[in-house]
Amino acid sequence: MQTDAPGDIPAPTPSPDHRAARPARSRRTTRPGGGPSLLAPGAARDPYRLYRVLREEHPLSYDAPLGAWLISRYDDVVTALTGPEFTGFPHDGAPRGGPAPLGLCHGSTGCLPRDRYTVVTGFVPRRLAERVERTAYVLARRIAGRRQADLVEEFCHWLPAGTGPFRSPLRTGDAAPADEGPCTRHTGLRETALASFLANLLDDPDLLAALRVEPTLAGRAWTESMRRDPPVQVVLRRTLTEVTLSGGTLPARAPVACLIGSAVRDPERFAAPDVFDPFRRDQADATTGPAGCPAVVLGRLEAEQGLRALLDAMPRLRWADGFRPAATGLLTRGPRSLLVRPG
């Protein structure tokens, strides 16, 4: 496993680790540039052990097989996603301060406020909301009479696909809709996020019972699922200038892999980060994507309406006998199958 810095990119300058004094963070340090590779065997099957090693021992390291610097701590990742010293990768012409492809957002500039107008945050056209609800109930009722079903194949795939196009109005009153972009055309991330959301809830029968009584809790459960199990695990960025992070200083024009899946499990930011807890006080707000992105808005709506339809059609919904969900993937991650007993 290659651990040296590449010949054409200078090694980072070590900087004091301001986290080292905290008990939760290991005091061990290694030479910047050394560390395990994101492409190591087994990383896609269980990346969280690798993430922990990177956060504690190699917060800034160059991954030669990947060809990028790895950053894994929450504060560092948020800096790379939002700071003006970073831009999109590999397109250096991406707008500064533009949204990174994060959460359910593909990074479309249409997801940002503009000088002429502002996208209505959290707004869903009434007809679209009705179509999401109708599609969710049709799919749920098709599954309800079966002895066993796969929610990924028979529900999570079809609900986002059946939602149709999203055209957001403009807050200024301009009648022209916002342009469609990749966030509205592509549904794969919403499918993956919905599958992780349902897996987290089915793993907790008590929480599922609480949601039957109080459906409004679904919003908090969705936010927590997006934190604990984000569909996009790695986002690539590029530095515009030298940038100092907790593990050292990155050179200008350096490719950087932001390990979202590691950042959202950082114990310096989240208490008991591996636990799915919709009632936590420290819910994530910086790694879910722009609030005005249509994919972000639709994903939440599909999760809330989809869960309600499933519970209405199948009050005794539970895992199939002997089944345990398993997430897979490195760049994007989620369960590929959710076998359930509808009744």
Each model region followed by its residue ranges:
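Cytochrome P450
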Residues: 1-343
